[in-house]
């Protein structure tokens, strides 16, 4: 079955301060953040990959830029966070697991190559960077078996930070949908993951990609760092 990929692109991206949706931010190589994500997905998983983009803010711009994928509309994009965007996408997903990306992650396709076997084997995971633990970033800790037991911006004694590339297996998906539904409107999707871990013991593995290129673009400095990869 073709892989299902969701890109979360509904938010307003106010911190970067651009007049367009953040995923359409141009990179130094001439592509947008969103375009490089889609090209990486197609390169690694083939043209049959089923890509859905969750849209909201200035959705027409994204629809025009990417007419060959499907779309999910979060009409409450200005009142809700990523928990509700992901919830909408998972509810209309097909059977099998779902890989999802934050719409502001610039990364090398080698990241997808590293995780492809886990996706085929339907093992839920969160990609992490253990070389940095930013105060503003979503951080994690693990239990004695190396499975994630905490995932939020408030985590103490964190082992690293999440980079915005994640996978939920088909068997775990219903639990995540239930807990995303239970999240507050302003929760990040990571809260839904935490609740699914706490309530159902869902096993989410951290996959270390510290040695590979991946940057989540929140501020101009992040964009500069992302662009340095293309120079």
Model-predicted regions and their roles:
Residues 96-106:
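Short beta-strand-to-loop acidic/aromatic patch adjacent to the donor-nucleotide binding site
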Residues 15, 105-107, 213:
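A short, conserved beta-strand element in the Rossmann-like catalytic core
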Residues 2-4, 31-98:
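Conserved N-terminal catalytic core of the sugar/cofactor nucleotidyltransferase
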Residues 1-19:
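N-terminal nucleotide-binding beta1-loop-alpha1 segment
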Residues 2-3, 161-231:
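Conserved alpha/beta core of the MobA/IspD/sugar-nucleotide pyrophosphorylase nucleotidyltransferase superfamily
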Residues 9, 28, 55, 102, ...:
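Short beta-strand/turn micro-motifs composed of small residues
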Residues 24, 140-142, 206:
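A structural signal for short hydrophobic beta-strand segments in well-ordered beta-sheet cores
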Residues 108-183:
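Conserved core of the sugar-phosphate nucleotidyltransferase
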